[in-house]
UniProtKB/Swiss-Prot annotation:
One of its GO terms (cellular component) is cytosol. Gene3D superfamilies: 1.10.1390.10, Glucose-6-phosphate isomerase like protein, domain 1 (3.40.50.10490). The gene is pgi. It comes from Rhizobium etli (strain ATCC 51251 / DSM 11541 / JCM 21823 / NBRC 15573 / CFN 42). GO terms for molecular function: carbohydrate derivative binding; glucose-6-phosphate isomerase activity; monosaccharide binding. Its main location: cytoplasm. This is Glucose-6-phosphate isomerase. Pathway: Carbohydrate biosynthesis; gluconeogenesis; Carbohydrate degradation; glycolysis; D-glyceraldehyde 3-phosphate and glycerone phosphate from D-glucose: step 2/4. One of its GO terms (biological process) is glucose 6-phosphate metabolic process. It is found in: Cytoplasm.
Length: 541
């Protein structure tokens, strides 16, 4: 594998100098040769520097890197998360074929199906009004309390699928900052509100602090006895859930082989299911399952997650591009970049290989983005003319949900196409100068101004096109990126499924709380921390 990486690196200088405009001019079939589809989902990677030689090397890299072997180990239930001795089986949660999936010799599918059925019954009962609040009123608002994977996935998917909402209004609280829950509680009435507390251990500080605030909101308004009618939980800590006052019939579990950032398919998706209904939630799972099958069955050169991961690795570890911009041209995907930020950076933000040695080269990139066209008026300037090359990943639906606003969607499509073309072709000095002189600028001034209007081009982008953002399409898109992260992690030779990097700060925060509360001295901390504690204490008085 290292030899192939070195071969790729030996072409890096030439690759960076690749004139994509010339490449398209020389090859009328470039788009068809460097794009792949899964049903209506098209992935166009022709506007990257990938050519026939690089593609062959990337395919060989996947073979020698053991991506296919690791892929089958994941799907078969092997404990590939070796630092926690856990299988990685979020794919089992959307295993619509219902074929057996074994963990330690036991088929997990009966349990998966049982939880999914229980979720469906509960969601239907809330949506229909069969399950009411303590005063007999139907539930009109659902507030999910969670953080990280227990929040980002449900928030993102619920926003994305707004046209399919036909249940109670959905709200989400994550931040321990009291302002977050305070602002949400102003929008709802206690009598008609259901809280879902999502915490596997029921000990997550942010979640349980907000849950206690929510509990007080209900108890003070409706009495202690009302708590059981206004809460549900997604957790495995049944004793702690019972102590909180939540009926065991309203508790939905999941398993240690489901990582938080991969948990939207599990009971963590309950608020989404309540919003869009069990049938649409099933279609969401169907879309992901279709990508799982495609990932396992399609040859590398026709395999969307494989190609996306290989190109991502190439950009990061061969060409050295440090970031990746996620640019959905769909306002309802406004939280998709943040969702992928956690998925990618928490998975592949590692500095140690599976052997316990330092990573050779780079691991995962910084992932960020905003929906278009908003980003065009914010940070695209740097993507087009800045000194850093930032690979961009665009996504656009051919059809929107507002036929009466078709013209606006056509404007949206024209913008995303223009951005990908502009990044590829750029604008030469001669073109910039001619544009200025055609407007009447004299030659000398045009020579001075034109450099500021030059776009170097040759900036890589990938574009995804699909029919419409349905539950099926969203499930497909998420699973595509999950498997992309997996492919890159295998090539980085890291464990993509633990997250020890989140622990140290949490541990230190626990020790600092008594200091912040004034119960302990800050003397054992560094001078910066001592100074910050003192400054905050002074302002708080």
């Amino acid at each position: 594998m290292n030899a192939i990486v070195e071969q790729l690196k030996s072409t890096a200088a030439a690759t960076k100098a690749t004139d994509l405009r010339a490449a398209f001019a020389a090859d009328a079939q470039r788009f068809s040769r460097f794009s792949v589809s899964l049903d209506d989902l098209l992935m166009d990677y022709s506007k990257t520097a990938v050519n026939d030689e690089i593609l062959k090397l990337l395919v060989k890299l996947a073979e020698e890197g053991g991506v296919e072997r690791k892929r089958e180990e994941m799907f078969s239930g092997k404990a590939i998360n070796f630092t926690e001795d856990r299988a990685v089986l979020h794919t089992a949660l959307r295993n619509r074929s219902n074929t057996p999936v074994l963990v330690d010799g036991k088929d997990v599918m009966p349990d998966v199906n049982a939880v999914l059925a229980a979720m469906g019954k509960f969601a239907d009962d809330i949506r229909s009004g069969a399950l009411k609040g303590a005063t007999g009123k139907a539930i009109t608002d659902v507030i999910n309390i969670g953080i990280g994977g227990s929040d980002l996935g449900p928030v993102m998917a619920t926003l994305a699928l707004a046209p399919f909402h036909d249940g109670p209004r959905a709200h989400f609280v994550s931040n321990i900052d009291g302002a977050h829950i305070a602002d949400i509680l102003k929008l709802v009435q206690p009598e008609t509100t259901l809280f879902i507390v999502a915490s596997k251990t029921f000990t997550t500080v942010e979640t349980m602090t907000n849950a206690q605030t929510a509990r007080s909101f209900i108890a003070k308004s409706l009495g202690e006895a009302a708590v059981q009618h206004h809460f549900a939980a997604v957790s495995t800590a049944l004793d702690k859930v019972a102590a909180f006052g939540i009926d065991s019939a309203r508790v939905f579990g999941f398993w240690d082989w489901v990582g938080g950032r991969y948990s939207i398919w599990s009971a963590i998706g309950l608020p989404l299911m309540i919003a869009i209904g069990p049938e649409n939630f099933g279609k969401f799972l169907d879309g992901a399952h279709a990508v799982d099958n495609h990932f396992r069955q399609a040859p590398v050169t026709e395999n969307l997650p494989m190609l996306l991961g290989l190109i991502g690795f190439y950009h990061r570890n061969v060409l050295g591009y440090p970031t990746r911009a996620i640019l959905p041209y769909d306002q309802r995907l406004s939280r998709f970049p943040a969702y992928l930020q956690q998925l990618d950076m928490e998975s592949n933000g590692k500095g140690v290989t599976i052997d316990g040695t330092p990573v050779d080269g780079n691991s995962g990139p910084v992932v960020w983005g905003e929906p278009g066209t908003n980003g065009q008026h914010a940070f695209y300037q740097l993507i087009h003319q800045g000194t850093s090359i930032i690979p961009a990943e665009f996504m656009i639906a051919a059809n929107a949900f507002e036929p009466e606003l078709r013209h606006q969607h056509q404007l949206l499509i024209s913008n995303v196409l223009a951005q990908s073309e502009a990044l590829m072709k750029g604008r030469t000095f001669a073109e910039a100068k001619k544009q200025l002189t055609d407007k009447g600028m004299d030659d000398k001034k045009a020579d001075f101004i034109a450099p500021h209007r030059v776009f170097t081009g040759n900036r890589p982008s990938i574009t995804f096109v699909y029919d419409k953002l349905t539950p099926y399409a969203l499930g497909r898109l998420i699973a595509l990126y999950e498997h992309r992260v997996f492919v890159e992690g295998v090539l980085f030779r890291i464990n993509s499924f633990d997250q020890w990097g989140v622990e140290l700060g949490k541990e230190l925060a626990t020790g600092l709380l008594p200091v912040v509360e004034g119960k302990e001295s800050a003397a054992s901390h560094d001078s910066s921390t001592q100074g910050l504690v003192a400054a905050l204490a002074k302002l708080a008085k």
